[in-house]
Amino acid sequence: MVKRRVWLVILLVMLWEGTGIMAAPVAPADQKEILRTLTLAQYSIKQGDYNRAITYVDFEGMAKIVMAGYWDKMSLNQKNEIITSMKNLIREKFPIITRQLKLLKFGAITEKGNQVLCEALAVLDHTTENKDQKIQIGLFKRGNEWKAVEVYILKEGFLAGLNEDRVRPILKRGGTIQEALEAIRLVFEEK
């Protein structure tokens, strides 16, 4: 009985602190704003209004994830260059998303670390070979707005994977930011 209470207390502390194996809940007002942001982004993409759609994406946050471990060492010009490159790469992908994505069905929203994660089911056009996929969309709050910053597939961040698999090896061996950007472009062209 005492052991059971100890485990219950540990579990409650983990939930309260938002650490450990459980994710912390998100306030209902924030959940409403997050769903509004994601719904408007999805609508803008489907309507082909890509200029509006990119307002719901945190390109600086994306660039920081891709360049993790090197961001603080980069000059302002290099940072601006990668942010602009990320924006252009994502904008180029919107027409492909428009053709293949029928709908995003949003689910539970939880807080994990410095991001909020929204579970979603990406319902794809079944005339392609793609199958529906469960994903998580990571968001940051910038000022008063929530913005998408990362997509997790099987709990692995796409941009964090780019950093680990492509960017970090290039920069570790003494390569340039330009080489890292080119590697990122190649990955986006593959997708």
Model-derived regions: residue spans:
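Low-complexity, intrinsically disordered terminal/linker segments enriched in charged
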Residues: 151-191
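Surface-exposed, polar/charged faces of alpha-helical domains
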Residues: 47, 73-80, 112, 130, ...
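Bacterial N-terminal signal peptides that target proteins for export
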Residues: 1-8
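Early exported N-terminus immediately downstream of N-terminal targeting peptides
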Residues: 25-98
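Surface-exposed, charged secondary-structure patches
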Residues: 24, 84-134, 181-191
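Short beta-strand edge/turn micro-motifs at domain boundaries
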Residues: 132-163
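Sec/Tat signal peptide C-region and signal peptidase I cleavage site
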Residues: 18-25
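Bacterial N-terminal signal peptides
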Residues: 9-18
